[in-house]
């Protein structure tokens, strides 16, 4: 069955909920138990991820809202929930007192004593929430690949702390841009483009860029961090992000089937590849409709794909159902 992954994108905004070490300790409330566990937050924050539990019942319900379950009708399995961990996230977390930070991360990621977040999304190189714009190979030549200070000083320490709390966390990664020396203005105009925003990947560098992915996954592995999955490009139809790169479905198909997929296979990487990674509406570009579906229809590309990633910033989430029905 073809998986569909819904990517949660954004900075880790629940940092606003972190505690201060000077606050008085709050009494530990008993954990409610029941058939269903409910976490609820209200606009007024009278409930702030408050945990409750309810039991199934076949009796008439006097409550204003009822949820009726039909066990004979099943849909896709929900693998988990999570958040983006960016350079800015990690920088701010490291400003906290170590005990406060650990308590906060435990509350967020622990299966036993927290909310049990099970996924993390990080960037390969910089993102729109990084401390600076960079890739891991800013000097021309793939032999110059190296993890950068933002990763070594901020992202890796926080990921290691999270993994010490919940070792089963799955990490999904995506680049916002390739190294600038691999960029061109467009595929029609192969003029080099030395700006972080927009541009396209020069096909002449497909193999080097695939090697870049391999080296990045291996570098994190050397730090004890497994990368569960990658996408070839964050928001491939977005020309205007702080760091961005346009990648049509044809480009992504060709990159995956001729470079990224084979390089992962040769390197023996278990890291999965998800297609697309953008909005439900495909930015209203007619030629990009059904972006991942068109990639699935190419057998040479689809053999390397696990599924597709979507963002919730545009269009209708019904597109997930459409894709699942068309490409089960």
Question: Where would I find each of the regions flagged by the language model?
Answer:
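Bacterial Sec-dependent N-terminal signal peptides
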Residues: 13-33
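Active-site neighborhood of glycoside hydrolase catalytic domains
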Residues: 207-229, 236-328
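Solvent-exposed loop/turn segments at secondary-structure junctions
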Residues: 87-91, 125-129, 176-181, 233-239, ...
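Sec-dependent bacterial lipoprotein signal peptides
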Residues: 1-16
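Residue-level signal for beta-strand positions within conserved beta-sheet cores that form or flank
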Residues: 34, 79, 167, 269-271
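N-terminal catalytic cores of secreted or lumenal carbohydrate-active enzymes
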Residues: 49-227, 248, 258
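N-terminal zymogen propeptides
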Residues: 29-59
